[in-house]
From Swiss-Prot:
Belongs to the Aux/IAA family. Preferentially expressed in roots and flowers. Residues 110-210 form the PB1 domain. It comes from the Eukaryota. Gene3D superfamilies: Phosphatidylinositol 3-kinase Catalytic Subunit, Chain A, domain 1. Homodimers and heterodimers. Interacts with TPL. Keywords: Auxin signaling pathway, Nucleus, Repressor, Transcription, Transcription regulation. It comes from Arabidopsis thaliana (Mouse-ear cress). Aux/IAA proteins are short-lived transcriptional factors that function as repressors of early auxin response genes at low auxin concentrations. Repression is thought to result from the interaction with auxin response factors (ARFs), proteins that bind to the auxin-responsive promoter element (AuxRE). Formation of heterodimers with ARF proteins may alter their ability to modulate early auxin response genes expression. One of its GO terms (biological process) is auxin-activated signaling pathway. Signal peptide: none annotated. This is Auxin-responsive protein IAA14. Pfam families: AUX_IAA (PF02309). The gene is IAA14.
Length: 228
C-alpha cells in the first residue's frame, strides 16, 4: 500500500495536485530571494555611481576656485578708484607741476617784504613782484600810508645819485622818503639801483623822515658809485 496515497494533505476534495516537498520549495524560495536581492543591489549601486559622478564634480570645481595659486580673474569694479580721491590726486599733481615750472622759469616766485613808517602804529607787507617800477611801488605805498609822498624820479624811475645836489633837494623837499635794507644789511635809499636789482636785494622797507634819511645819502651815493 502506497503511503503517499493515505497521507493527509490540504486541498479541495478530489484534487490531484501534489504539494512539493519543503526541501524543493525551499530551494525555489531561496533562488527567488537571491535574485530579488541581487536586482536591488544592482539598482542601488547604479544610483550611487550616478550620485558619485555628480558629487565628485562639485568639489573639484570648488577646489579649483579656492586654489590660491590660481586666483580667478577679477573684473575692475565700476567706480574704482573713487572719483573724489582720483580728482584730488590729479589736481595735486597738476599744481605741483605748475609750481615746478613757475620756480624754474622764475615768474611765479613772490617777494614779500615788510613795510614800516615812522609814526605809524602798524606794519604792512607788499609783494615786490606785483610791481614793475618804482612809480608803481610809490603809488601803492601812498595808498597804504596817506601821509607818505615820494619825490620825483628820473626817466628810469631812479634817483640820480650822480648829482648830489638833486639828492639833497629831494630829501629836503620830501617829508618822508623810502629806504630799504639790502642783503648786506645796509640801509639804502630806494631808487639807487635798477628795479630788478632792487627786487632781488630788498629785505624790508622803511619810510623814514627826510631829515633822518640825509645821513643815508652819502653812504648811498658811495655805494652807488662802487656798483657803477
Amino acid at each position: 500500500m502506497n503511503l503517499k496515497e493515505t497521507e493527509l494533505c490540504l486541498g479541495l476534495p478530489g484534487g490531484t495536485e501534489t504539494v512539493e516537498s519543503p526541501a524543493k520549495s525551499g530551494v525555489g524560495n531561496k533562488r527567488g530571494f537571491s535574485e530579488t536581492v541581487d536586482l536591488k543591489l544592482n539598482l542601488q549601486s547604479n544610483k550611487q555611481g550616478h550620485v558619485d559622478l555628480n558629487t565628485n564634480g562639485a568639489p573639484k570645481e570648488k577646489t579649483f576656485l579656492k586654489d590660491p595659486s590660481k586666483p580667478p580673474a577679477k573684473a575692475q569694479v565700476v567706480g574704482w578708484p573713487p572719483v573724489r580721491n582720483y580728482r584730488k590726486n590729479v589736481m595735486a599733481n597738476q599744481k605741483s607741476g605748475e609750481a615746478e615750472e613757475a620756480m624754474s622759469s622764475g615768474g611765479g616766485t613772490v617777494a614779500f617784504v615788510k613795510v614800516s613808517m615812522d609814526g605809524a602804529p602798524y606794519l604792512r607787507k607788499v609783494d615786490l613782484k606785483m610791481y614793475t617800477s618804482y612809480k608803481d611801488l610809490s603809488d601803492a605805498l601812498a595808498k597804504m600810508f596817506s601821509s607818505f609822498t615820494m619825490g620825483s624820479y628820473g626817466a628810469q624811475g631812479m634817483i640820480d645819485f650822480m648829482n648830489e645836489s638833486k639828492v639833497m633837494d629831494l630829501l629836503n623837499s620830501s617829508e618822508y622818503v623810502p629806504s630799504y635794507e639790502d642783503k648786506d644789511g645796509d640801509w639804502m635809499l630806494v631808487g639807487d639801483v635798477p628795479w630788478p636789482m632792487f627786487v632781488e636785494s630788498c629785505k624790508r622797507l622803511r619810510i623814514m623822515k627826510g631829515s633822518e634819511a640825509i645821513g643815508l645819502a652819502p653812504r648811498a651815493m658811495e655805494k652807488f658809485k662802487n656798483r657803477s
